[in-house]
Swiss-Prot record:
A molecular function GO annotation: structural constituent of chitin-based larval cuticle
Keyword Repressor attached: no
Name of one Pfam family that matches: Chitin_bind_4
Protein name: Cuticle protein 7
Top-level taxon: Eukaryota
Length: 145
């Protein structure tokens, strides 16, 4: 006793009792959400390069999982940075300077040294005795000269 309309409305018939007046009513049909379609992400990559006649340059590239940017002066010195996503999913960021003194880098992926300064090495009793005997001999030789 329920008719679904192709236009998004549904209708109900009047009451079957001859003694009760029931007007026709309508209500919107339930909305059925179509199945979602998975769309692969689009990998957008860009790159740039600009250089003047004396060798100064700015260049780099960016894509979904890595980026690199650098500037170079006329003497060939470079300052730049790059980043990428490691296989573990960590974003690795690196800044660098390359000049006449070498390649200098700062990165969140470099090993970190110990925070506590190690205790000085203490000579064993045998080493201390050998050093004392050696210094005594050195003083004897100095006295002869």
């Amino acid at each position: 006793d329920h008719i679904v309309s192709p236009h998004g409305f549904s209708y109900t018939s009047a009451s079957l009792s001859p003694y009760v007046y029931a007007p026709y009513t309508y209500a919107a049909s339930p909305y059925i959400n179509p199945a979602s379609v998975a769309v692969a992400p689009v990998n957008v990559a860009t790159s740039y390069h600009a250089q003047d006649v004396i060798g100064q340059a700015s260049y780099g590239h960016v894509d979904a999982y890595q980026a690199h940017h650098a500037v170079q002066d006329a003497a060939g010195n470079k300052v730049g940075s790059y980043s990428y996503v490691s296989p573990e999913g960590k974003v690795v960021k690196t800044n660098y300077v390359a000049d006449a003194t070498g390649f200098h880098v700062a990165s969140n992926a470099l090993p970190v040294g110990p925070t506590v300064v190690p205790a000085p090495v203490v000579d064993t009793p045998e080493v201390a005795a050998a050093k004392a005997a050696h210094l005594l001999e050195v003083e004897k030789v100095k006295g002869r000269v």
